[in-house]
A protein has these predicted regions:
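Short helical (or helix-break) motifs at transmembrane helix termini and adjacent helical loops
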Residues: 150-161, 217-229
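Membrane-embedded alpha-helical segments of transport systems
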Residues: 154, 181, 247-255
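Membrane-embedded alpha-helical bundles of polytopic integral membrane proteins
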Residues: 2-211
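Juxtamembrane boundary at the C-terminal end of a transmembrane helix
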Residues: 262-270
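Interfacial loop-to-transmembrane junctions
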Residues: 230-253
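Hydrophobic alpha-helical transmembrane segments of membrane transport and translocation systems
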Residues: 254, 258, 262-263
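Hydrophobic alpha-helical transmembrane segments of integral membrane proteins
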Residues: 123-124, 128, 237, 254-255
Length: 270
């Protein structure tokens, strides 16, 4: 794969700015961190729906963002049971939309049932998977975010310089097997060092955790690539120079963070 130095520079600058914003939010926590999470959720939902609806169905987007914000804010306020009610309310609204429009076909040729499914998929994909960001400790958030960042960065730079074998051409023609291996190695090394310095578990436990985080991060990346492939777009948006959209940047985190949150409940890595 050819190396584009201009893209590398844009990608690096954007990455540093994003890292600074995230670090500041993690240091201040409280309402600042919640505001950043809500912003990511809103932009991510907007991009997700744009993949399928273009610039249409604005009321549905606003409704989904409001429900997603409710889920995240209530979880942040330690009212998880109430947060799940927002997800249930989303299903009821989607079901009502289908009930009253079940025999209609919209201008894009999308049946009402498919539109309702897209609405629910957006709620489950973004705000639901972002919930751990509202309650994980700063140490844990830094760990999982940095592990995913190392995975993505290693995959990009190894893939662009040494990638010759396609990983899954039908899903993502630009991803290489070499990049996937580089991503795995980089993530495992980072997790092992981070765990040895700040963790409670053994180094090999963190190495295994690094394998799991990387596996889910790559699955999240491939899932979002498949979504874009299905609707024939390259990026979810052009909001972030060198990176694409919010979903292009957060796709790996959306899969890796919930997995880590569940595993940490059982094995107490920190």
């Amino acid at each position: 794969m050819a190396v584009d130095h201009a893209t590398d520079i844009r990608r690096t600058i954007t990455g540093l700015v994003l890292a600074a914003i995230v670090v500041l939010a993690l240091v201040l926590r409280g309402w600042v961190l919640l505001a950043l999470i809500l912003l990511v959720a809103a932009l991510g939902l907007w991009e997700f729906f744009s993949l399928f609806w273009g610039n249409k169905r604005i009321p549905s987007r606003v409704c989904a963002i409001a429900l997603g914000w409710g889920m995240l804010t209530l979880t942040w306020a330690h009212r998880t049971q109430d947060a799940l009610v927002c997800l249930g309310a989303g299903f009821v609204l989607a079901a009502m939309s289908f009930l009253f429009r079940w025999n209609e076909v919209e201008e894009e040729g999308v049946p009402a049932f498919a539109a309702s499914g897209i609405f629910m998929a957006g709620l489950a994909y973004i705000p639901l998977l972002l919930l751990p960001a509202t309650y994980l400790s700063t140490t844990k958030l830094i760990f999982v975010l940095a592990a995913v960042a190392v995975s993505d960065t290693s995959a990009y730079f190894v893939g662009t310089r040494f990638g010759h074998h396609k990983l899954w051409p039908r899903v993502s023609p630009n991803k290489s097997s070499e990049g996937a291996v580089g991503s795995l190695v980089g993530c495992v090394i980072f997790c092992t060092i981070y765990g040895a310095c700040l963790g409670r578990a053994s180094w090999w436990a963190f190495a295994l955790l690094g394998i799991a985080i990387n596996a889910f991060a790559q699955l999240g990346d491939l899932f979002e690539s498949a979504l874009k492939r299905a609707v024939h777009v390259k990026d979810s948006s052009n909001l972030l120079p060198g990176h694409g959209g919010i979903l292009d940047r957060a796709d790996s985190i959306l899969f890796a963070m919930p997995m880590f949150a569940v595993v940490d409940q059982w094995f107490f890595f920190f």
